Amino acid sequence: MSIFDKIRFIIKIFKENNMIIVNGYNNYPFILTFILNIFSCNKKFVATESDTQLQIPTNPIKRFVKWIYLSIIFRNKYVLGFSGGSDSHKDLFRHYGMQGERIFLMPMMVDNSKFYQKNKVLPEVFYFLYVGRLVKHKNVEELIKVFKSRFSNLNAELRIVGSGEEEEYLRNKYQSEKVKFLGKKFTADLVEEFQKASCFVCPSIYEPWGLVVNEALSAGVPVIATKEVGASYDLINGKETGCVAANMAEFGDYMVELFNNPKKLLVFSKNGSDLMQNKWNYDFYTNCLNKSIKKVKKWQ
């Protein structure tokens, strides 16, 4: 599809609908839709769906440009914020001037059912599982260092699924019988890794959401995540499905705690599975979407 065909398609969608949902707010589909709405006599509600947490740039120029751009967009009464989470994700919209009544939770989702298992059985070897890209901000090297310092003489293994720019460096430096790099895995092979894991670890320095947390909990696998992981507020904090660490030293403490406490591990496992089967699922997403549509209809 050429750029002109894409533009024609966006204009067609704009004309045919009273409410338009766009993923993100800094791409040409959203910007074009926003501009069309400014000049249209027949105003539409334009929802931007975002998994981005509030993060204010330290660079003053970037901070100013971001404030100008997002303030113009988010203060517009026809723009809605569809927030992937209910804490810092909503703060993003609030910070740049969007009124609370125009902000809706639109929960970040995966197909949970692919990962369900009836009875979680803990393996003889305690498997810590990481799934994700091997890039700097995922903090995998620090995870490996913490694991090696705490579990060198214990019956535990760190299994790393994924690839990325740091893969060769990390493999060459850390691969061993206890730290295994498994490369990319998909579909049934990936599900199998989740289902046999004892505990999932997400040590990111920055993570807008982290759908791997959804996948792990759906498989009944407790999660240890850093506080920077966007999913931690809705899926871990106060849910007894895992632990949220303020730093990597605390992260390591939680790894040891769950290793030494199989009863707690199984409680977290059941709670995580229950949360994903009975609450944070496609039905919940549908209810949130219908609620937003119902409210918008009253404004039209």
List the model feature ranges, each with a label.
Residues I11, F39, R63-F82:
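Membrane-proximal helix-turn-helix segments that form the acceptor-binding/catalytic region
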Residues E168-A188:
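Nucleotide-activated donor-binding/catalytic signature segment of Leloir-type glycosyltransferases, i.e.
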